[in-house]
Curated annotation (Swiss-Prot):
It is found in: Mitochondrion. GO terms for cellular component: mitochondrial inner membrane; mitochondrial small ribosomal subunit; mitochondrion. The gene is MRPS33. The keyword Ribonucleoprotein applies. One of its GO terms (molecular function) is structural constituent of ribosome. It comes from Homo sapiens. This is Small ribosomal subunit protein mS33. Belongs to the mitochondrion-specific ribosomal protein mS33 family.
Length: 106
């Protein structure tokens, strides 16, 4: 037996295409490219998209702990204090319909 029949040759090539294998024999340089394309893309690898923790979950958790008095966020405390002092001085943002444009019309 010298080689495969035409039918067997075409079927082997078709099965290689279906199952993501190399259809024709290639050199090592081309096999490197085939190997790169057969791997998952960088964006779909778990270590890439799971690199940073879920910010929304942690922010909600820390805010809940802050309101319960179990966590102290000095920066947020400072911002709240500044907002409170601004309101006492009468410098807070006007409510909707009470701004400069609305005052002109009255």
């Amino acid at each position: 037996m010298s080689s495969l029949s035409e039918y067997a040759f075409r079927m082997s090539r078709l099965s290689a295409r279906l199952f993501g294998e190399v259809t024709r024999p290639t050199n090592s340089k081309s096999m490197k490219v085939v190997k790169l394309f057969s791997e998952l893309p960088l964006a779909k690898k778990k270590e890439t998209y799971d690199w940073y923790p879920n910010h929304h979950t942690y922010a909600e958790l820390m805010q809940t702990l802050r309101f319960l008095g179990l966590y102290r966020d000095e920066h947020q405390d400072f911002m709240d204090e500044q907002k409170r002092l601004k309101k006492l001085r009468g410098k807070e943002k006007p409510k909707k319909g009470e701004g400069k444009r609305a005052a002109k019309r009255k």
